[in-house]
């Protein structure tokens, strides 16, 4: 009976570790250091956009933002951490303009 409990504990820990590793992929270093200001989080823009070679293309923004997705996002997924790290799961047939081009004018 003790062996069964130890095996179940090991399976549980392996599952938790795997889930945490997937979360680390989501909250990697490619995120915007944005604040809670609505103007910044609501502007639809994307720095890392991936598209298929199909016609029409299927594009998805892989940027990770803090606390919220832009206002045009219909399916936003966030971590439960503080601050939350969010990624828009929408697919479109185009890429939004780059976020970096709008933020670099503040130098």
Curated annotation (Swiss-Prot):
GO cellular component annotations of the record: extracellular region
Signal peptide per UniProt: 1-19
UniProt xrefs under PROSITE patterns: BOWMAN_BIRK
InterPro entries linked to this entry: Bowman-Birk_prot_inh, Prot_inh_BBI
GO molecular function terms noted in the UniProt entry: serine-type endopeptidase inhibitor activity
Keywords: Disulfide bond, Protease inhibitor, Serine protease inhibitor, Signal
Annotated positions for site Reactive bond for trypsin: 80-81
Keyword check for Cell membrane: no
Pfam family, any one: Bowman-Birk_leg
Site annotation Reactive bond for elastase: residues: 53-54
Disulfide bonding pattern of the chain: 45-99, 46-61, 49-95, 51-59, 69-76, 73-88, 78-86
This protein's record includes keyword Amino-acid biosynthesis: no
PANTHER family linked to this entry: BOWMAN-BIRK TYPE BRAN TRYPSIN INHIBITOR, BOWMAN-BIRK TYPE PROTEINASE INHIBITOR C-II
Family: Belongs to the Bowman-Birk serine protease inhibitor family.
Extra remark beyond the main annotation: Two forms of the inhibitor were isolated. The shorter form is probably derived by proteolytic degradation.
Functional note: This protein inhibits elastase and trypsin simultaneously and independently.
Protein name, UniProt field: Bowman-Birk type proteinase inhibitor 2
